Amino acid sequence: MYTNKQIWSVSYPILLSLLAQNVINVTDTAFLGRVSEIALGASAMGGLFYICIFTIAFGFSTGSQIVIARRNGEARYGDVGPVMIQGVLFLLVMALLLFGFTKAFGGNIMRLLVSSESIYDATMEFLDWRIFGFFFSFVNVMFRALYIGITRTKVLTINAVVMALTNVVLDYALIFGHFGLPEMGIKGAAIASVIAEAASLDRKSTR
């Protein structure tokens, strides 16, 4: 029988990992609100589009997580690796396809949602860089599924902290041009988010 403390020690890192992706959007909003209303609106639209695509990968990883947890519970540890590898490869292919889809049709979709020409242009500038994050965030959710499935969820806490801190520092640096980096505005926010996702993936893959 598990105690409440044991259950909480496993579950709270999962909660933090769920919040991590949203923290990126909140951080972008906080910094871009100091740039202009156009940048703020564009990051909101671009961030929402990104999250909608991201949930496709998240849904697949949840299914993989169930399989991994079952293999782990059955003590079939050797079967966990193949599930993980297949999941990563599948999500990388999915990331490539959705990257291409967004490049080809993202502008048309935004035209239907955004009436302001200036916000549309800023949104597309944001997305042109932000969608490179697909390749990192899609693999990220597969590692999340692995660590939850084998109940090593404390790794997710470190991952969430690394992602949040990296994004805050790089947002400040790239949006406003600090630490010797160029002032890039909304494009800087997108690049910072992608690098933050890459940094968190590096932490997961090296644990």
Sequence positions of predicted segments:
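Alpha-helical transmembrane segments and their helix-entry boundary regions
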Residues: T29, L40, T153-T157, I186-A190
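Transmembrane alpha-helix boundary and packing residues in multipass membrane permease domains
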Residues: I14, L18, A30, G47, ...
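Helix-terminus/linker motif at the lipid-water interface of multi-pass membrane proteins
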Residues: L19, V23-G41, M110-E117, A173-M184
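Short runs within selected transmembrane alpha-helices of multi-pass transporters and secretion channels
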Residues: S61, Q65, R130-G149, L156-N167, ...
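Small-residue-rich hydrophobic transmembrane alpha-helices
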Residues: L40-K103, S137-T151, V155-L156
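Signature of the first transmembrane helix
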Residues: K5-Q65
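Short alpha-helical transmembrane segments in multi-pass integral membrane proteins
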Residues: M1-S11, I68-G133, L181-R207
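Alpha-helical transmembrane segments of multi-pass membrane transporters
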Residues: T102, V155-M184, A198-A199, R203-K204
